[in-house]
């Protein structure tokens, strides 16, 4: 067996080739991070092997720098292993007491790990889907947060330009209101609008729910409004609504891609009532391979949902707060998914009510339900069985 260790960096990659007997077949050599470098790597590997030899390629998970070099050995049909940099660091320290860390040393370390660590798992199609899901769900998370900030700006601007509007509509953040404010960004513009045009804008945007009487009500409120006439704020409001609409379209496109991958993954956890595609995809993406975790408690710790402990002498903390370490995306997905599951699933609803009856605050009770949900998800992913309501 031939082990190829690759230390990844932005502009070049250091490579080292080792046999399973520990013989150095190719000392550390460097290839540029381009097509010529990739093309030169494969003949070098083939030159060190015999037809019957198995080849293993290993590299560290270094974020976006490793994506392209990772795809090359996979496209060549070579089993490829992606290793956690922390794992590599600890392994290197176990080999020597010297504080030596260079790209050349890391390449040797990765090759040695491939030779000695039989528990490493190769990169598979499932790993690819997890990476795609992680990119998409995190991208969506950031877009949704960006949109939320813009919606706060809309609320702030309406308070300045037409504060009475909020009491006349179910929400400021609906299509009909955004259409109205895009056309008439302020009380003064609405007050001067022709009633027929105002009624048409509202009726078309609300699909007929807002009639002439609603248009009169809004115009009368605008004519008696205390809102300021500030052209700069009106322009900001129009542009902010335009940005929100663009983000809505982008988020919809992202969610479409997520749905396509989830159809391929076909995870059983989406059968849990209240656990939708979006939160389910985020949980799957952040956890990755469930077999990497010995128990559901390890996933809780990875998400930062385990209780912290502080003890010194006779002092022990009375209230254990969540550690809030690890993946904040996973923590967010689990906590929010739990809230919806507790609404739609009677078993979880009863469990949440039980914790609330014990006097626990709402968020504390939800955190207990979250632990229960993680254990359920872990069991379902390991067994592959869909969710069944307890009888």
Predicted regions span which residues?
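A detector of single, family-specific signature residues
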Residues: 1-391
């Amino acid at each position: 067996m031939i082990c190829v260790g690759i230390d990844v960096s932005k502009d070049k990659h250091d490579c080292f080739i080792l046999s399973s007997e520990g013989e150095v077949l190719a000392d550390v050599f460097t290839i540029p991070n381009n097509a010529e470098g990739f093309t030169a790597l494969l003949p070098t590997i083939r030159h060190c092997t015999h037809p019957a030899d198995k080849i293993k390629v290993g590299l560290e998970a270094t974020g976006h720098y490793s994506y392209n070099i990772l795809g090359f050995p996979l496209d060549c049909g070579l089993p490829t292993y992606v290793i956690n940099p922390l794992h590599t660091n600890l392994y290197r320290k176990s080999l020597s007491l010297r504080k030596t860390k260079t790209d050349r040393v890391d390449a040797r370390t990765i090759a040695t790990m491939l030779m000695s660590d039989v528990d490493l798992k190769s990169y598979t199609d499932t790993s690819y889907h997890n990476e795609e899901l992680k990119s998409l769900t995190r991208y969506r998370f950031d877009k949704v947060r960006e949109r939320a900030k813009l919606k706060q700006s809309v609320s702030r601007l309406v308070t300045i330009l037409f504060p009475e509007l909020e009491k006349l509509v179910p929400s400021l953040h609906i299509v009909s209101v955004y259409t109205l404010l895009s056309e008439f960004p302020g009380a003064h513009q609405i007050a001067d609008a022709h009633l027929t045009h105002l009624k048409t804008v509202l009726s078309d945007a609300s699909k007929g729910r807002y009639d002439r009487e609603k248009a009169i009500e809004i115009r009368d409120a605008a004519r008696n409004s205390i809102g300021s006439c500030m052209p700069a704020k009106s322009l900001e409001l129009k542009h902010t609504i335009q940005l929100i609409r663009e983000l809505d379209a982008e988020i919809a496109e992202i969610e479409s891609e997520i749905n396509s991958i989830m159809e391929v993954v076909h995870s059983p956890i989406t059968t849990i009532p209240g656990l939708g595609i979006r939160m389910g995809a985020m949980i799957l993406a952040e956890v990755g391979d469930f077999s990497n975790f010995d128990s559901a408690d390890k996933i809780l710790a990875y998400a930062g949902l385990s209780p912290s402990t502080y003890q010194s002498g006779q002092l022990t903390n009375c209230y254990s707060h969540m550690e809030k370490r690890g993946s904040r995306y996973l923590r967010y997905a689990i906590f929010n998914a739990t809230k919806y599951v507790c609404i739609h699933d009677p078993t979880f609803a009863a469990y949440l009510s039980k914790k609330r009856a014990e006097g626990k605050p709402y968020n504390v009770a939800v955190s207990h339900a979250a632990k229960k949900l993680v254990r359920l998800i872990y069991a379902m992913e390991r067994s592959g069985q869909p969710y069944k309501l307890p009888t």
